[in-house]
Curated annotation (Swiss-Prot):
InterPro entries: Pept_A31_hyd_express (IPR004419), Pept_HybD-like_dom_sf (IPR023430), Peptidase_A31 (IPR000671). CDD domains: H2MP_MemB-H2up. Pfam families: HycI. One of its GO terms (biological process) is protein processing. SUPFAM superfamilies: HybD-like (SSF53163). Belongs to the peptidase A31 family. GO terms for molecular function: aspartic-type endopeptidase activity; enzyme activator activity; metal ion binding. This is Hydrogenase expression/formation protein HoxM.
């Protein structure tokens, strides 16, 4: 019997506080564990529709994400199979979620759709802090979220082995959690609402 292709996907935007939850989960799994052939970890970031081909190739899809369930900040909620698309479209707070809902729809339309879906989502606390990191209620759910994924895999005979060396990075080194937070500017120096280079400025008045 051929082993299933399993895709473990983290989606979100590291630059917008709790939006980075999904990517941080996959980052930690990659740092700590080695997985058997057929299991792939991917930082999906905000790629949206460009993830279709990866979803089509998966027999089993595990997604980590920050999702507005309308619950208390930091609440971890697990959704499976046919319910997943509904929650990926609930009270959308970022462009990538719209894109990923479309990813699932296109994969289903093509006939190449995962047999199993698992969404491990956390209710965010803050999304409007550009350059910010995870808030404490959300950060506290990283370990529980990893346990859910590892238990789900173990139930299917997929065992993660502890790494004994450095892993190949899924994202550029400066975005690793420790370096990212260490390089965060002080509050009085930072602009937390976006990249000022791309925000329209009021024209200067002539003297």
């Amino acid at each position: 019997m051929t082993a299933p292709n399993i895709l473990i996907l983290g989606i979100g935007n590291l630059l917008w506080a709790d939006e980075g939850f999904g990517v941080r989960c996959v980052e930690l799994l990659n740092e700590r564990y080695r997985f058997p052939d057929g299991v792939r970890l991917m930082d999906g970031g905000t790629q949206g529709i460009y993830l279709v081909q990866h979803v089509q190739q998966a027999d089993c899809l595990i997604v980590f994400d920050a999702v507005d369930y309308g619950l208390a900040p930091g609440t971890l909620k697990i959704v499976r199979d046919d319910e997943v698309p509904r929650f990926m479209g609930a009270k959308r707070m970022s462009l990538h979620q719209t894109g990923f809902q479309d990813v699932l729809a296109l994969a289903a339309f093509s006939g190449a759709y995962p047999r199993e879906l698992l969404l491990i989502g956390v209710q965010p606390e803050e999304l409007e802090d550009f350059g910010g990191s995870l808030r404490e209620p959300v950060r506290a759910q990283l370990e529980p979220a990893l346990r859910v994924a590892l238990e789900f895999l173990a139930e299917r005979g997929v065992v993660a082995a502890a790494r004994d060396g450095d892993a190949e990075r899924l994202a550029p080194a400066p975005l690793a959690l420790g370096r990212y937070e260490a390089g965060r500017p002080a509050e009085e120096l930072a602009y937390r609402h976006g990249d000022i280079r791309f925000i329209p400025q009021q024209p200067l008045e002539d003297d």
